[in-house]
Regions:
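Domain-level signal for soluble alpha/beta catalytic cores
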Residues: 3-230
Length: 230
């Protein structure tokens, strides 16, 4: 269990004036150097190690800019991810992804992000990849800054698995949605504990699911009615 009697947060509060008057979501535009490196990796022009080195360099540069801007909470810009939310899900057992053929509707165009779906019972049996991502960031913490880890909210995870194109796969392994909800919750507990053990004291849950649910076209998209969305 997590012991909150004495944490890095308490030490941080003693050295930095709180509450903060400003913060940022933590996701930043990828520099051209990083975007090119990812393309080169996908086309097998560079190795995974070379891509990681470039990610490290770009994150280091970003953190310097964050500190120069006066931010008390720093992030890695989500520079190691393909998308802001799906990479986190890919770190769970029972979740797979493939290149999309149709994309996901987004503001009148198709976002060509990987189709992500369930291929087994959801859980976390090993160390989640985001833990190592966070450990790299902790080297930049000082008396004025603390590292923040951003992850999609559990509701975002659930919504991904009940989207029309993913629902068929989900039903193969979960006849009861409540069972899926519980497995997702248990998986989050494991990852949060792993992050805590790695020194993380600031986690941000990003949730865009509500915006989709209140859209007037949501019942049609989810093949249900207003009551079904509740």
């Amino acid at each position: 269990m997590i012991d909150l009697t004495h944490t890095k947060v308490e030490e941080f509060i003693m050295t930095v004036q709180t509450p903060y008057r400003y913060d940022v979501v933590g996701s930043f535009l990828r520099p051209e150097k990083l975007k090119q490196a990812r393309k080169d990796y996908e086309s097998k022009k560079i190795s995974r190690e070379e891509l990681t080195q470039i990610e490290d360099e770009c994150i280091t540069d970003l953190v310097q800019k964050e500190k120069a801007a006066g931010l008390h909470v720093i992030t890695d810009g989500e520079f190691r991810r393909a998308t802001w939310h799906l990479d986190f899900m890919w770190g769970f057992d029972g979740v797979s992804h493939t290149p999309t053929k149709t994309g996901l509707p987004f503001h009148g165009e198709a976002a060509m992000i990987d189709d992500t779906y369930i291929t087994g019972k959801v859980g976390v049996s090993g160390t989640h990849p985001f833990v190592e991502h966070f450990k790299f960031l902790t080297q930049f913490e000082d008396e004025n800054t603390i590292a923040k880890q951003t992850i999609p909210a559990p509701a975002q995870f659930l919504e991904q698995m009940i989207l029309p194109f993913a629902l068929e796969n989900t039903k193969k392994y979960y006849e009861d949605t409540e069972e899926l909800v519980q497995d997702i919750a248990n998986g989050y507990k494991v990852v949060i504990q792993q992050l805590y053990d790695a020194g993380c004291r600031c986690i941000q849950f990003d949730d865009c699911s509500w915006g989709m649910l209140v859209d007037e076209k949501a019942p049609l998209f989810f093949q249900t009615d207003q009551e079904g969305l509740l």
